Curated annotation (Swiss-Prot):
Family statement drawn from the similarity comment of this UniProt entry: Belongs to the peptidase T1B family. HslV subfamily.
Keywords: Allosteric enzyme, Cytoplasm, Hydrolase, Metal-binding, Protease, Sodium, Threonine protease
Gene responsible for this protein: hslV
Species for this entry: Sinorhizobium fredii (strain NBRC 101917 / NGR234)
Name of the protein this chain belongs to: ATP-dependent protease subunit HslV
Regulation: Allosterically activated by HslU binding.
Reactions it catalyzes: ATP-dependent cleavage of peptide bonds with broad specificity
Summary of subunit composition and partner proteins: A double ring-shaped homohexamer of HslV is capped on each side by a ring-shaped HslU homohexamer. The assembly of the HslU/HslV complex is dependent on binding of ATP.
Gene Ontology cellular component annotations, sorted alphabetically: HslUV protease complex; proteasome core complex
């Protein structure tokens, strides 16, 4: 247990993005845990931004993630159709702003052209193998998706199976999958 939170650490989620076959899919599970207790099983941690042209998913503290989603939405309004630029500007603010620096979350964002992971360290990472995952079960989902990328499975099937595998292994990930899909370049 932390000195700030008598209930322990909040653990939340697995988010994965798969880009394959002219589609980009982002999927996340619905579990939010506080310490050893499942607080909610149907949280929605994947959503559309920027008039539906961008999909975003978050892992970490929920209030912090919503703050970052609002900031990203503002950056997308400032830099329309420039997800990379908006993400870099958000990462710069996140790293240098005294208030934002303390936010504990990670984000995956994608549009028709690019998929990015954004961290509080100022990192904006673009995956090289068509998939990336974050959160407590992120490594399990990522490994599963990488193993399936050469199969004949669709992006949707890969994302769903990867989350299923992560949910089987990670106690902070469940099988309640929310998925958003965009047509990709």
């Amino acid at each position: 247990m932390s000195e700030h939170n008598p209930y322990g650490t909040m653990h939340a989620t697995t988010i994965i993005t798969v880009r394959k076959g002219g589609k980009v899919v982002m999927a996340g599970d619905g579990q939010v845990s506080l310490g050893q207790t499942v607080m909610k099983g149907n949280a929605r941690k994947v959503r559309r931004l920027s008039k539906g042209d961008v999909i975003a998913g978050f892992a970490g503290a929920t209030a912090d993630a919503f703050t970052l989603l609002e900031r990203l939405e503002a950056k997308l309004e400032q830099y329309p159709d420039q997800l990379m630029r908006a993400a870099v500007e958000l990462a710069k603010d996140w790293r240098t702003n005294k208030y934002l620096r303390n936010l504990e979350a990670m984000m995956l964002v994608a549009d028709k052209s690019v998929t990015l992971a954004i961290t509080g360290n100022g990192d904006v990472l673009e995956p090289e193998h068509g998939t990336i995952a974050i959160g407590s079960g992120g490594n399990y989902a990522f490994a599963a998706a990488r193993a399936l990328m050469d199969s004949d499975k669709s992006a949707e099937e890969i994302a769903r199976r990867a989350l299923q595998i992560a949910g089987d292994i990670c106690v902070y990930t469940n099988h309640n999958v929310v998925m958003e899909t965009l047509d990709a370049d």
